[in-house]
Amino acid sequence: MSDLAAALEIVGARWSLLVVERLLDGPQRYGDLQRDLGVPTNVLATRLRELEAAGVLTRLPLRHNTRAYALTDRGLALRGTILALGEWGRGDVTGEI
């Protein structure tokens, strides 16, 4: 498996990078992620579980039996990749696509 294929196994599923992008702003509660992203709750639960298992994010216990999610160092390492993808999506990358 190539390095890119290995990375896509972790963050290539729909919504995964959008969850990571949202968490770059800091820890978020489940309900806030769901509302801000508009992702179906069952899909969000699955993506959070997958990203946690891969060491990209962690759950933080809060009061009243609620949790927040925050990026680990491994998740924070995706910042440059996410910013580059955003620039590419805007067409700001020089050269031909």
Language-model region placement:
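Short beta-strand "wing" residues that participate in macromolecule-binding interfaces
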Residues: 59
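Basic, amphipathic "hinge/linker" alpha-helix immediately C-terminal to the N-terminal HTH DNA-binding motif
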Residues: 12, 63-85
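Residues within the DNA-recognition helix of helix-turn-helix
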Residues: 47
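C-terminal regulatory/oligomerization modules of transcriptional regulators
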Residues: 80-97
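Glycine-centered, phosphate/nucleic-acid-interacting loop/turn motifs that mediate DNA/RNA or nucleotide
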Residues: 55
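N-terminal helix-turn-helix DNA-binding core of bacterial DNA-binding proteins
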Residues: 2-43
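Short, charged/polar surface micro-motifs in flexible loops or helix N-caps
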Residues: 26-27, 76, 91
